[in-house]
Amino acid sequence: MSDPRPSQAEKHKLGRAASKFKDPSRAMQSDDYFARKFKAINGSMGPATLNTSSLSEGGGGGGGPANGTPAVPKMGVRARVSEWPPKKDCSKDLACKTLWESRSQSSYESATSIIQNGQNDQVDRQQEEQLDLDFVEAKYTIGDIFVHSPQRGLHPIRQRSNSDITISDIDTEDVLDQHAVNPNTGAALHREYGSTSSIDRQGLSGENVFAMLRGYRIESYDPKVTSSFGFPDFFPCDTAISPSLHAAAQISRGEFVRISGLDYMDGGLLMGRDRDKPFKRRLKSESVETSLFRKLRTVKSEHETFKFTSDLEEGRLDRGIRPWSCQRCFAHYDVQSILFNINEAMATRASVGKRKNITTGASAASQTPVPVGPAGGCESPLGSKEDLNAKENPDADEGDGKSNDLVLSCPYFRNETGGEGDRRIALSRANSASFSSGESCSFESSLSSHCTNAGVSVLEVPRENQPIHREKVKRYIIEHVDLGAYYYRKFFYGKEHQNYFGIDENLGPVAVSIRREKVEDPREKEGSQFNYRVAFRTSELTTLRGAILEDAVPSTARHGTARGLPLKEVLEYVIPELSIPCLRQAANSPKVPEQLLKLDEQGLSFQHKIGILYCKAGQSTEEEMYNNETAGPAFEEFLDLLGQRVRLKGFSKYRAQLDNKTDSTGTHSLYTTYKDFELMFHVSTLLPYMPNNRQQLLRKRHIGNDIVTIVFQEPGALPFTPKNIRSHFQHVFVIVKVHNPCTENVCYSVGVFRSKDVPPFVPPIPKGVTFPRTGVFRDFLLAKGINAENAAHKSEKFRAMATRTRHEYLKDLAENFVTTTTVDTSAKFSFITLGAKKKERVKPRTDAHLFSIGAIMWHVVARYFGQSADIECLLGISNEFIMLIEKESKNVAFNCSCRDVIGWTSGLVSIKIFYERGECILLSSVDNSSEDIREIVQRLVIVTRGCETVEMTLRRNGLGQLGFHVNFEGIVADVEPFGFAWKAGLRQGSRLVEICKVAVATLTHEQMIDLLRTSVTVKVVIIQPHEDGSPRRGCSELCRIPMVEYKLDSEGTPCEYKTPFRRNTTWHRVPTPALQPVSRASPVPGTPDRLQCQPLLQQAQAAIPRSTSFDRKLPDGTRSSPSNQSSSSDPGPGGSGPWRPQVGYDGCPSPLLLEPQGPGSVECDGSGDHEDLMEVGRLPETKWHGPPSKVLSSYKERALQKDGSCKDSPNKLSHIGDKSCSSHSSSNTLSSNTSSNSDDKHFGSGDLMDPELLGLTYIKGASTDSGIDTTPCMPATILGPMHLTGSRSLIHSRAEQWADAADVSGADEDPAKMYTLHGYASAISSSAADGSMGDLSEVSSHSSGSHRSGSPSTHCSKSTGSLDSSKVYIVTHSGGQQVPGAVAKPYHRQGAANKYVIGWKKSEGSPPPEEPEVTECPRIYGEMDIMSTASQHPAVVGDSVPEAQHVLSKDDFLKLMLPDSPLVEEGRRKFSFYGNLSPRRSLYRTLSDESVCSNRRGSSFASSRSSILDQALPNDILFSTTPPYHSTLPPRTHPAPSMGSLRNEFWFSDGSLSDKSKCADPGLMPLPDTAAGLDWSHLVDAARAFEGLDSDEELGLLCHHASYLDQRVASFCTLTDLQHGQELEGAPELSLCVDPTSGKEFMDTPGERSPSTLTGKVNQLELILRQLQTDLRKEKQDKAVLQAEVQHLRQDNMRLQEESQTATAQLRTFTEWFFSTIDKKV
């Protein structure tokens, strides 16, 4: 017998198979690993007999087992693992286990001597030492056990026909040696397969062992024996009591097999988590083992084989097993480039072109599974079951078990029945729902403004394309499209570049394209002038595409020279595994780039064919559907919706293999286009029908070869299952069932079947919805079909086909299109360098790659918050995207735009990235590398506008207050100057992202406030604001991508926005108009009739996706996310969600936005698109040129006609004061008395400032102030105004950033863009009607005043009827109409306010206006609603005076009000619509008994008046500069109210943080000078009122101050109102309605540059108005000219079209005449 101790070189020599051994005994030696374990358990064994059908009997050798009875395994072709060997004594087993787990590197004999109780080893001691050393040198993985690869020198266990041992009988310290013998018997342990072997040796050539294993079926398979592994049945065993599993478990616990993250295995041989390393030498890379096991357990395809190096004694693995890591400095162009793995290409090279066809699609489901029994378990890989069983056991997949009335669960298929959504690994409120059942995921992802994970492709976005991605603007995102395939066409084709082809010995045919280009913006690259673009292609479908900066490449040449670096050095650095000498330069032929284009773009197709099967009632089988000769009316209706019928004969567009010449495939077909795609439908009823052919092969020939099939079911059809279909190609079935066909309420329900290896695709089907018959449903269905086919191409079957094609392309290029020129070396041959020392390469510039445009990649571990797990990912950060790609599934797990990143918290080895509204992802470095985190932070600084977060610990003052306001977004609205929060560094505009370690993104507003109020220690993590004080926001909040997309039907009325579905089938209870969208200015929540439509409203709100974090609580208590108005950047003032059914002013809706509605009519979202609004909103021209009197008076007329419920209730507000009194405690931590207020709110008047109209949030019972500064119980008289004016609105925000954008404000605005003063006044009163002072979440305190994404924007109001909020609109009632008293009655206040009406005239009961306490009045704007009714509707005060509507520029109004304001100094700069679009609304803070300056009661009043213009004019005051600070303290030196004080009040509210920093220490509540004429008793009463004491005196006093201060504002508004009249050039009537005394007193402003008298103001106004009129007149003239030009162009266009048609007809006539003449001559 030959020496059983071969040398290492001999033992591991590559390419040596067992069949080459000359010695027969050696040839039969076992390669099992567990020989010593066998001795311990089984004792000595007798001589083994070769090639017999019986197992050798143990016990013949030196000693018996511990129990004294030799164990005899059962007889048979295979050893029964489940019952062999018998269970040993527990103590003995324990001893074995203890020894095994405590084993160190001791020699083998010391261990085995204990286990075997003195058995004499028959193997030489030196051999044992050698074996043990071998084990120490090479740690064997699970791949060693299962992979047979003779060429690698590794020989795993085989299932033998004749076996003498079982799995558990082998010791794990045995080395993999084909020459090993049984130490006890001397018999060879390695057995060749016996005569009954069913394993075909063709698979053992080393090229692919999994092909052999997958086709192999175990011979004597007992039904009770199941596999304990996740692999095809390699080892049959009984998982219940098998001692084999116990032994294997011990082996695993002893770290024989070390596999990371394995949890799902049956706890036997393969155990889960990582262990400590007991040996010095392990497999070097943990990721190597993970990748290995991942591939093993998924058994994806044959091409995933694993290669080992020949020098295992060094413990090294070949690079084929190690995940390839591209150079960090390489910037990837697209997602699939990040997934490029050159090692996979090496591993799969041998199997390319040899992969078997496997049964997939419907055929896999239709195959009847063959039960596996003892007789049927063994089949050859080449047997009859090859196709079906090539991947795994046919009965292994039972489907997902999901069924409904549309679909039945089916093996090999996965169902989508509704509610499925994209996986979210980020920490947000949305990921609390499960991945598969989260209904919110469905609605969010169906219309999200963000790319879905599968929709992200190109990562490098040019600067000019960054503002808006066109794909996002469209309704549905197309997924699974490799848009990066255009890389060569875009950056190489037609440009100077080099192509190199070759056949690498490891990779096979390869193609490299490389081009040096100058960086377009060197400033971004910090001096780097050039980069190299590289495209590297192998036979794998993934291509390495990207660029590397020249400065990042180590080279022997100088960087930045005109010549550039040697290409060889660039390629060696980027792709070190590539054999550069094999490359040859491509031939100089025009065919080369064309072939490369075909190669790269072979997977791109914009032409799809989709089959349509018609299923009648009671049908379900394929044969029945194919034999439906003609279509029914319901099917015809569906086809008409889906596309257009085309005549096939002569059809020149995409015909999908249909005959367009002889009509052999039918005369007509269905064709349509969607985005860039052409779709031809193979409709079963339009294809030829053969009465005598039951199989209808002419139809099945086309439909059966379509990947995607739509199955249309009539009512009564049976549920569909792919089991009834027989086709290898049909991988996706979209089931569409019609309800109420051929009626107005026709709708469709949808379900989807997809083959199990087809990845999910969007748009997701919302749960429990039906789709109306609209264009939106059509788009949904077409997008679903396109994405289905794209996803199907990701399945294994189609990828294998594409890989073969790609391999042939590359092979052809490498063989037929190359020259003899190799890749250039660094320098040409030079005599000077002969004999010189080799030149060293210059090190690259540090961190140069961080300035690349493409995606830089890091290996990280991401926290999956939805499942509380960690997943290994690849982090890619480009100039546009941040994405995480899961290593295991190779799918994008997360993506967001860099412009949405607002901050990050970086640690030593981890980083938390916050984006959008505080959602976050948590990443940590794989190898605990702090350098990776540093680079990630640097990269974020370069490509985002975020910043590092700051952690603060906030203290409470003596009253338990934190001293700041925070709105529902977590943005700090106000900070008490010099308070604890201010001293800690908290500033206005800061964004709270964590409160007490809880992410704000996961909290509702109420939870956030409760956390701040109740936490003993308040630790917050904040993101500092921008330098201008504006909070950091994601781009999706600021610009709302995509824009609103209206789709007009045939009547020209807009269909619903991007909401293709409703929550339930009650969607169709409304007539056809219900299918139309909510007009932006249309919804009126104040009508009781709307209560009937609440289900519809809830459906509408649910359909609107959310990209903002606000909540809206519906009447039923559910929360909605209304702000993402169809992912709109301009939702307009009209509703962006459901409306509160409660009346605004007890049933009196807003006079501006009312819809015509008859009594008792039902109005739902989208059900009333009204004529006047459509006049404004339907066409832009009408918006620009509609007469203002017609537009706005019609609003007001409808206001009067809409609801008469307010006519009998002049004092209806008397009950509100009681409702507002909820909590009078002043000990709350946030100085809030009414933070969680009364729930019986009334809100939503439908006014322009109605937060529901603004798309703002509604949180029932939550305080906008976050309870930090809210009000005590206040009287109803001042209740409403305080509701709005108690908060500051810092609107300086982001006007500067958009100053150069489109300008829609200015003096030349069209009069159609107007507010009625009544409109925004009623907004205040409507909020007052809410009855809850502290309950202002619906007008939530936005710190920066710009609109929320879903809130009204002004520039897109052409289609919505919204008005321009960049101007102060002062509109009087026109037409001489008598305003009914009912309009004014709701604006009267109970108590003191009812004694007089604020306006230019005051009643006798009003106190004298010279009280200086007016500056402490809590309502500068509070009574503006009364003022507006007095000024606009003189019927309230006296006779109606007909006045025209007028508009005053906002800038001019501010100049009038604030002469010294920076707005004037800046020359009345205009503000872009982006400022108005910004999702930040004005900060509407409730009146507080304790102001932000907690001890100064009155100062909160003064500071809170700021919002008067903000409430009236959302985003009207976008202060783009930092205004000077003006004290909010009452002016103690001015006995009369002054414009200066008014200005101060404005600017304190709107000032930036730098202004606040100049505040003096507030001290106690300021007291006015006694000389001011204020009675001290009144002051005491006021103070008592602040403390929550309810007294008539207090009410009257406060009401008086509020109304008087508002009177001053009213005076200016009315001045503007009067002077802007076209009939009033000079306003001589002013003296008639203005009290000269009062006018003097509150117009006199000592020390101001502006005129100090009313006359001066009038003159100033006259000048302004004349200029405005002049500008307006010029603008109208210009527009008229433009309209005339447009009309001329249209006429010219029509004329040219007619001429073209005439010329065409003449040419046709001439052609016919010509040919007829020729024919006659012939």
UniProtKB/Swiss-Prot annotation:
<feature type="modified residue" description="Phosphoserine">
    <location>
        <position position="1030"/>
    </location>
</feature>
<dbReference type="GO" id="GO:0098793">
    <property type="term" value="C:presynapse"/>
</dbReference>
<dbReference type="InterPro" id="IPR050989">
    <property type="entry name" value="Rap1_Ran_GAP"/>
</dbReference>
<feature type="region of interest" description="Disordered">
    <location>
        <begin position="1328"/>
        <end position="1361"/>
    </location>
</feature>
<feature type="modified residue" description="Phosphoserine">
    <location>
        <position position="384"/>
    </location>
</feature>
<feature type="modified residue" description="Phosphoserine">
    <location>
        <position position="1478"/>
    </location>
</feature>
<feature type="region of interest" description="Disordered">
    <location>
        <begin position="1068"/>
        <end position="1172"/>
    </location>
</feature>
<feature type="modified residue" description="Phosphoserine">
    <location>
        <position position="149"/>
    </location>
</feature>
<feature type="region of interest" description="Disordered">
    <location>
        <begin position="362"/>
        <end position="404"/>
    </location>
</feature>
<feature type="region of interest" description="Disordered">
    <location>
        <begin position="1"/>
        <end position="29"/>
    </location>
</feature>
<feature type="modified residue" description="Phosphoserine">
    <location>
        <position position="1461"/>
    </location>
</feature>
<feature type="compositionally biased region" description="Basic and acidic residues">
    <location>
        <begin position="384"/>
        <end position="403"/>
    </location>
</feature>
<dbReference type="GO" id="GO:0099092">
    <property type="term" value="C:postsynaptic density, intracellular component"/>
</dbReference>
<dbReference type="GO" id="GO:0005737">
    <property type="term" value="C:cytoplasm"/>
</dbReference>
<keyword id="KW-0175">Coiled coil</keyword>
<dbReference type="InterPro" id="IPR000331">
    <property type="entry name" value="Rap/Ran_GAP_dom"/>
</dbReference>
<feature type="domain" description="Rap-GAP">
    <location>
        <begin position="596"/>
        <end position="813"/>
    </location>
</feature>
<dbReference type="Pfam" id="PF02145">
    <property type="entry name" value="Rap_GAP"/>
</dbReference>
<feature type="modified residue" description="Phosphoserine">
    <location>
        <position position="1245"/>
    </location>
</feature>
<feature type="compositionally biased region" description="Low complexity">
    <location>
        <begin position="1091"/>
        <end position="1103"/>
    </location>
</feature>
<feature type="modified residue" description="Phosphoserine">
    <location>
        <position position="1591"/>
    </location>
</feature>
<keyword id="KW-0597">Phosphoprotein</keyword>
<feature type="compositionally biased region" description="Gly residues">
    <location>
        <begin position="57"/>
        <end position="66"/>
    </location>
</feature>
<feature type="region of interest" description="Disordered">
    <location>
        <begin position="1197"/>
        <end position="1246"/>
    </location>
</feature>
<dbReference type="GO" id="GO:0005096">
    <property type="term" value="F:GTPase activator activity"/>
</dbReference>
<dbReference type="Pfam" id="PF21022">
    <property type="entry name" value="Rap-GAP_dimer"/>
</dbReference>
<dbReference type="InterPro" id="IPR001478">
    <property type="entry name" value="PDZ"/>
</dbReference>
<dbReference type="GO" id="GO:0098928">
    <property type="term" value="P:presynaptic signal transduction"/>
</dbReference>
<feature type="modified residue" description="Phosphoserine">
    <location>
        <position position="1472"/>
    </location>
</feature>
<dbReference type="InterPro" id="IPR021818">
    <property type="entry name" value="SIPA1L_C"/>
</dbReference>
<dbReference type="InterPro" id="IPR036034">
    <property type="entry name" value="PDZ_sf"/>
</dbReference>
<feature type="compositionally biased region" description="Low complexity">
    <location>
        <begin position="1120"/>
        <end position="1131"/>
    </location>
</feature>
<feature type="coiled-coil region">
    <location>
        <begin position="1652"/>
        <end position="1712"/>
    </location>
</feature>
<protein>
    <recommendedName>
        <fullName>Signal-induced proliferation-associated 1-like protein 2</fullName>
    </recommendedName>
</protein>
<dbReference type="GO" id="GO:0051056">
    <property type="term" value="P:regulation of small GTPase mediated signal transduction"/>
</dbReference>
<feature type="compositionally biased region" description="Low complexity">
    <location>
        <begin position="1220"/>
        <end position="1237"/>
    </location>
</feature>
<keyword id="KW-0343">GTPase activation</keyword>
<dbReference type="GO" id="GO:0098978">
    <property type="term" value="C:glutamatergic synapse"/>
</dbReference>
<dbReference type="Pfam" id="PF11881">
    <property type="entry name" value="SPAR_C"/>
</dbReference>
<feature type="region of interest" description="Disordered">
    <location>
        <begin position="45"/>
        <end position="73"/>
    </location>
</feature>
<feature type="compositionally biased region" description="Basic and acidic residues">
    <location>
        <begin position="1197"/>
        <end position="1218"/>
    </location>
</feature>
<dbReference type="Pfam" id="PF00595">
    <property type="entry name" value="PDZ"/>
</dbReference>
